C-alpha cells in the first residue's frame, strides 16, 4: 500500500507548511512487496504497505470534510475487489476512509492543544470473502499547529515590594506567561514581554519577564505604590502575534531615611504642685515620616534642673514621649523647671547616615502652680507611751503640724473618732497636746492607733492627717489564776505521797522580767489530812496525797483551796479551788468510775414476793383507769325535763366554709339570775382598742324580754365598737353596690319580725327545740312584741 497523489490545492497547502517547518524531518515512503521469495532455505514475507505519517492543519472550518491523504495497496488492481478498513483513535468518529479508493478525510474540527496526533490502523480486505489480503499496518496523523492561543499569565495578577531608594536595576518580581501552541513549530509559542504601564519607574526584560527598577531613589513618603501592566506577545512580538496582559502592584517598602524632628524648639506646661507622683505632666512627639520599626524612637532628658524630679518614657503605640513626675512638687521651694529632651531613632540604616543626624533636641519648661495645701505634720508617725494607771487628763504627748503655703494659716487639731471609738483620748485643738480621757487597761488593748486631723483655720476643708501609736505600759493589776480548768481524780487505792495533779498559773499582766508564781495551800487547808501541795519553783506546783484509803461511799469529792501569789510590785494573789474526785481505778491506776453508787441492802424478800407486789400495783392502776373512763362515758337520759335549762349550740353538719363566730353556749339560768352580770366577751380575730361599755344588770322578767334585751345589747356593742364589726352584723358603707340574688347564707336574720315563714313545726321536734319554738312560734308572746 502506498501514499496516493493529492489534489492540487491541498498539495499547495502542504508545500507551504513544509516551507514553514525548518529542519523538519519527514519519513520517505518505503515500499515492500507482498510477494514472498525464498533464500537459503528461509522464507521471508516482505511488507506490502506503503507506510507514512500524515499531517493535517488544526482549526479547519470548511464545510466539506478535510482531505488527509490516500492509502493504496499493491494488491489493489483497481477493479473494486479490494475494500479498505480503518480502525484506531478517531476512526469513524473523526476520520473516515473511502473503502474503494482509500482516501482519508477528517469530519470534525481538530485542535492540536486537545490532541496532537492520532494513531490509526488500516487493512485491505477482499470484498468477496471479507478476508484480509495483507497484514494490518499502523500509521499516524499529526495535527499541524497554527497560532490560535494567546499567552496567559497563570499566576497573575501579581503583588510585589521593593525597598524605597533602591538603585536602578533592582529586581522586583518575575512574571511568566505560557502559550498553549506548539513550541517546536514556528514562533507560535515564542513569547516576549513588554511594559504597557509603569514607565519610567520600572522596566521588564523581554525574554525573562523580570521587572526591575528604572529610576533611582524612589521615595516611599512621596508615593508608596505603583500599578504596572505587563504584556506577553507570541510570534516573537511580531505583527499578527497574539498577546495577553497582567497587572503588577509594586509597593515601596520603608527604609529609615527620615530622621526624627520636633515640630517646635520649645514647649511649656503648667502643673499644680499637688500633682500626685507618677502623674503625666506632658506628652511630646518628634515627627518621623518613616513607619514601623524605622519610626521607633527613644526619648531621654539630657540636661536641665529637673533631671531628678521628672522622667520621660515612650508610648510604644504612639511613639510619644511621656513626661511624668518622680518627686513631689513644692511651689514654695521651686516654681519652675527646665528640661532638655532628645529624641533619637532606635534603628539607624548606615546607608542613609548622610541624611542625618537621626536625632533631635527640644526644650521643655514646666511651671509649678501654687495650690492651697493641707497642713503637714512634722512627723508621719508619732510613738507615745502611757501607763495604764494614768489618771484621766494625764498628758501623753504632743503633735505638731504647719501650713506649708506662704500664708501659713493657723492649724487646729482633732482626733478622728473612727480610730478612737471608745474616746480614750483627747487633744487640745490649739496646742496638739494629747491627754487621757478615760481609764486605760493594757489587757484590753495594749496599743491604740489613732489618727490626728490638722485643719487650716481659714480653710477647714484642707485637712492633714498624722498617725499616733500609743502604747499602754503595764502595771500589776491582775491576780494569777489557774492556767486551765483542771479535772483531778484520785484513786481509791492511791498511796500516800502519790502525785495526782500538776498545776500552773497564768497572769494577764506582762512584767518586764517575766512571771514568777508562788503556790501554797490556804491556812484553813494547810493541815488537812488528805492532800498536800509542793511548789516546784518553776511556776508549777504538784498536788500529792497524804494518806490512803479513799472511799467514794464516804466522800466522793474533795475541794482543795490553793493560794497563788505573783512577783509583781505590789504583788497580787488569788485563791483557786481544785476539785478532786474519788474514782474506782483499774490495776494501772486508770479511773473507771467516779460517780457515787447507790448500794441496796438486802430486804429479806424473795423473788416471788417482789413479783406479787408488782402485780398488785399494776392491777390497782388498771382499775383506776377503768373508773375514770366509765365516768367520762356516762350517758344522759334521752328525754329531758322541760324545766331543765338547755345550753343551745350550733351544730354543724357538712360545713363547707366558715360560718359565724358566735358559737358559744349560754346558760339560761344565768340570763335569769339577777345577781350575775355578764362579762364582756371580746372577739377572737381582733384586739379591741377601747373598753366595752358597762352593762346594767337584768331584772327578773319573762324569757322573751330577756332574749330581746340580750340581743339588742349585743347589737349595740357591735355598733359602737370601732375596731371591727362582728361577722353577723349590718355594716354601713358609702356604697355597697347591688344586692346579691341569693342574699346572705351565713347567718339568720334574728332582728326581722315580718317573716312569713311558719315555725310551728318546731314544737313537734321534741324538748331540744322547745326554746326555739317559743322564740319563732306563732304564740301570743313574740320576741319583739
From Swiss-Prot:
Residue stretches making up the Cadherin domain: 49-153, 154-262, 263-377, 378-482, 482-599
Signal peptide residue numbers: 1-27
Glycosites: 449, 530
Alphabetical list of SMART domains matching this protein: CA
Keywords: Calcium, Cell adhesion, Cell membrane, Cleavage on pair of basic residues, Glycoprotein, Membrane, Metal-binding, Repeat, Signal, Transmembrane, Transmembrane helix
Transmembrane portions of the chain: 608-628
SUPFAM superfamilies referenced in this protein's UniProt entry, alphabetically: Cadherin-like
Domain of life (superkingdom): Eukaryota
Listed Gene3D superfamilies: Cadherins, TCF3-CBD (Catenin binding domain)
Membrane topology value: Single-pass type I membrane protein
Keyword Cell division appears in the UniProt entry: no
Propeptide regions on this chain: 28-47
Cytoplasmic compartment spans: 629-785
Keyword rRNA processing (UniProt): no
Subcellular location, principal: membrane
Entry text on domains: Three calcium ions are usually bound at the interface of each cadherin domain and rigidify the connections, imparting a strong curvature to the full-length ectodomain.
Official protein name in the record: Cadherin-7
Protein species of origin: Gallus gallus
